[in-house]
Amino acid sequence: MEMKEEIEAVKQQFHSELDQVNSSQALADLKVRYLGKKGIFRSFSEKLKQCTDKAKLGSLINDFKTYVEDLLQEKSLVLLASEQAEAFSKEKIDSSLPGDSQPSGGRHILKSILDDVVDIFVHLGFCVREAPNIESEANNFTLLNFTEDHPARQMHDTFYLNATTVLRTHTSNVQARELKKQQPPIKVVAPGLCFRNEDISARSHVLFHQVEAFYVDHNVTFSDLTAILSAFYHSFFQRKTELRFRHSYFPFVEPGIEVDVSCECCGKGCALCKHTGWLEVAGAGMIHPQVLRNGNVDPEIYSGYAVGMGIERLAMLKYGVSDIRLFSENDLRFLQQFS
């Protein structure tokens, strides 16, 4: 049989075999049989060496090979579509079947308390503002009337990222920013994370949440401060809560007070309240005139108050939790009580 006739016979054989292919694996086998290293086209190449009209027959073989490759590619696409359709048909979803319920997570108790605190202040007329956790030493200390030698500026109390940048120790940095940004009246509540280089114990942690609220306007008095504190704690605890105000020193307020609430864990004294029956929950006072001046606000015309409170302390009081460390240990047995 001449080479040309042999090629024609192989072409008919290929068509016959291709028609019988019904899977991707069968197609792969057919491809190897014709185009593989030991396939039919390889044998054509060997026979071509013995022919006299190599150019014409070589061109004929190449055209046939291209033809075979094109048909194999077309068949591959057809089989792929068919196999995908079959797979999809087997994976059909019966929408009449009942769905599997997925257990939903819950908000962390501290997030819930934080939102509750902010909502109360918003209802009292405050607007929400935020500031970065990484803050300049100026906004965190200098503009808030901390002297250069104040202990809070030391590395054993504050986390320094470099000589002039710190992890903020309070959300009062919002106050420093807002006073520079706008003129009174200013009535802001500022929630966020704070960081202090402290020993971790039942009462303190290196990472905690704080909310600062401050109000600057004409004729803001100390009575306005005590009134807002009473209104807040009554709304937060949903009951009459006993408050105690103690004179204290904070660089950014004058006069300054610490706010204590009666300890609900024991009512008379435990490790949480150091056996006093009272738990400190906030620091507050009238904004220091120098802080107002640093924010380009005239203290002869305007006055204001500020209060900062720890969210963890509020959660401990509200739910009778005696150890602040429980909030950050990710123990689901503890956290799911509040979901």
Curated annotation (Swiss-Prot):
Cellular compartments per GO CC: cytoplasm
Database matches in CDD domains: PheRS_alpha_core
Gene3D superfamilies tied to this protein: Bira Bifunctional Protein, Domain 2 (3.30.930.10)
A UniProt-annotated Pfam family: tRNA-synt_2d
Name assigned to this protein: Phenylalanine--tRNA ligase alpha subunit
PROSITE patterns reported for this sequence: AA_TRNA_LIGASE_II
Gene: pheS
Binding site for Mg(2+): E254
UniProt enzyme class: ligase
Cell compartment(s), UniProt: Cytoplasm
Record flagged with keyword Ligase: yes
Alphabetical keyword list: Aminoacyl-tRNA synthetase, ATP-binding, Cytoplasm, Ligase, Magnesium, Metal-binding, Nucleotide-binding, Protein biosynthesis
The record's free-text note on cofactor binding: Binds 2 magnesium ions per tetramer.
GO molecular function: ATP binding; magnesium ion binding; phenylalanine-tRNA ligase activity; tRNA binding
